[in-house]
């Protein structure tokens, strides 16, 4: 099975583990529009875009899958494959809430320009990446076993002291800067996956023996 076909479907924890994937969730951002897509694998397909953009409109059109306009914004390492599936599902649920049942409330919180539209520069609307970071933080509040977020850059995570101090079990690292984005990003994501698999497979340190009184 190709990675493209594999990425187009929802994958349960057992499948991810049998297929040799690490317990991770990937967050990609569109360089032109600021839109965000979540994936269980280090790639995504048009089918995922169709499922993640529930009610597209002129301010939030379905984006293209062209690889040159997408960049990995964050990779999240979780303690287990079950936790990675739970995080992915929760992120998708929050996206659905913003776009469908709570759309009016979400629209009221988005920064507007003088014409009442979502603020943008050219085609880029930063509100989508900001909402994705807020949703990621909210979901990680409930993550079991801690997590490590590999960010595109320090700026992308927001104010660390203000937004992340309440999550001491979440560690933060930063992806190396890339020149040839498509090729180098693929290699870096592969390295992160291999490292996360080794960490997941490593035995937990033994608990200290109880001391007699």
Curated annotation (Swiss-Prot):
One of its GO terms (molecular function) is single-stranded DNA binding. It is found in: Nucleus; Mitochondrion. GO terms for cellular component: mitochondrial large ribosomal subunit; mitochondrion; nucleus. Signal peptide: none annotated. Keywords: Mitochondrion, Nucleus, Ribonucleoprotein, Ribosomal protein, Transcription, Transcription regulation. One of its GO terms (biological process) is cellular response to oxidative stress. This is Large ribosomal subunit protein mL67. It comes from Eremothecium gossypii (strain ATCC 10895 / CBS 109.51 / FGSC 9923 / NRRL Y-1056) (Yeast). The lineage of its organism: Eukaryota, Fungi, Dikarya, Ascomycota, Saccharomycotina. The gene is MHR1.
């Amino acid at each position: 099975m190709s990675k493209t076909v594999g990425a187009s479907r929802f994958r349960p924890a057992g499948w991810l583990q049998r297929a040799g994937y690490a317990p991770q969730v990937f967050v990609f951002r569109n360089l032109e529009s600021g839109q965000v897509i979540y994936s269980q694998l280090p790639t995504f397909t048009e089918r995922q875009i169709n499922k993640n953009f529930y009610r597209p409109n002129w301010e939030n059109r379905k984006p293209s899958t062209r690889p040159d306009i997408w960049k990995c914004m964050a990779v999240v390492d979780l303690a287990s494959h079950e936790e990675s599936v739970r995080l992915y599902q929760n992120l998708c649920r929050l996206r659905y809430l913003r776009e469908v049942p709570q759309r009016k409330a979400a629209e009221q919180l988005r920064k507007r320009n003088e014409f009442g539209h979502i603020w943008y520069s050219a085609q880029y609307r930063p509100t989508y990446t900001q909402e994705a970071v807020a949703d990621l933080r909210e979901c990680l509040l409930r993550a079991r076993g801690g997590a490590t977020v590999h960010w595109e850059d320090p700026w992308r995570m927001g104010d660390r002291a203000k937004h992340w101090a309440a999550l001491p079990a979440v560690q933060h690292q930063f992806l190396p800067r890339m020149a040839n984005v498509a090729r180098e990003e693929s290699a870096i994501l592969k390295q992160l996956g291999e490292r996360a698999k080794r960490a997941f497979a490593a035995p937990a340190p033994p608990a200290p023996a109880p001391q007699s009184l």
